[in-house]
Amino acid sequence: MIALIQRVSRASVVVDNQTLGSIDKGLLVLLGVEREDNREKMEKLATKVMSYRVFSDENGKMNLNLEQVGGSLLVVSQFTLAADTGRGLRPSFSGAGTPDQALTLYEEFVAFCRDKGVTTETGQFGADMQVSLVNDGPVTFNLQV
């Protein structure tokens, strides 16, 4: 399971000209599911995302996590993160999770974060989305479990 996280001052996702999710300070999470992923991996990754210290403390050091800064999550499904780009000029998605598996784990990821008290907004699974963000830093990390 893969989470590409970006520290943002604001982010939103639009589908069919309607804003589905919007946050101010927090993390934009592009979430990719691979074939071997399961609930255990999802919980480990969600915990890591929520606990990852990517926000600056009073000394300017990345030392604070999402909860410590009162931040939110915007979680957007992104199967292209599971692409194999090692050969040729066209990505292979053979390692990506099935649509049913990915939808289940995406929904469980969102529910897990909400159950932990984190304000969590979403896009629409499988939709053509327009994602807007102001990347604070920029700060971007690729987390995998």
Curated annotation (Swiss-Prot):
Keyword Magnesium recorded: no
Top-level EC class: hydrolase
Keyword field contains tRNA-binding: yes
Transmembrane segments: none
CDD domains in UniProt: Dtyr_deacylase
Broad class of the protein's primary localization: cytoplasm
Enzyme Commission number, as recorded: 3.1.1.96
Catalytic activity, as annotated: glycyl-tRNA(Ala) + H2O = tRNA(Ala) + glycine + H(+); a D-aminoacyl-tRNA + H2O = a tRNA + a D-alpha-amino acid + H(+)
Keywords: Cytoplasm, Hydrolase, RNA-binding, tRNA-binding
UniProt GO BP: D-amino acid catabolic process
GO cellular component terms, A-Z: cytoplasm
Domain of life: Bacteria
Pfam families (alphabetical): Tyr_Deacylase
GO terms for MF: D-tyrosyl-tRNA(Tyr) deacylase activity; Gly-tRNA(Ala) deacylase activity; Ser(Gly)-tRNA(Ala) hydrolase activity; tRNA binding
Localization annotation: Cytoplasm
InterPro entries recorded: Daa-tRNA_deacyls_DTD (IPR003732), DTD-like_sf (IPR023509)
Sequence motif: Gly-cisPro motif, important for rejection of L-amino acids, positions: 137-138
The protein's assembly and partners: Homodimer.
NCBIfam families hit by this protein: D-aminoacyl-tRNA deacylase (TIGR00256)
PANTHER family: D-AMINOACYL-TRNA DEACYLASE 1, D-TYROSYL-TRNA TYR DEACYLASE
Protein role: An aminoacyl-tRNA editing enzyme that deacylates mischarged D-aminoacyl-tRNAs. Also deacylates mischarged glycyl-tRNA(Ala), protecting cells against glycine mischarging by AlaRS. Acts via tRNA-based rather than protein-based catalysis; rejects L-amino acids rather than detecting D-amino acids in the active site. By recycling D-aminoacyl-tRNA to D-amino acids and free tRNA molecules, this enzyme counteracts the toxicity associated with the formation of D-aminoacyl-tRNA entities in vivo and helps enforce protein L-homochirality.
Family classification: Belongs to the DTD family.
Protein name (Swiss-Prot/TrEMBL): D-aminoacyl-tRNA deacylase
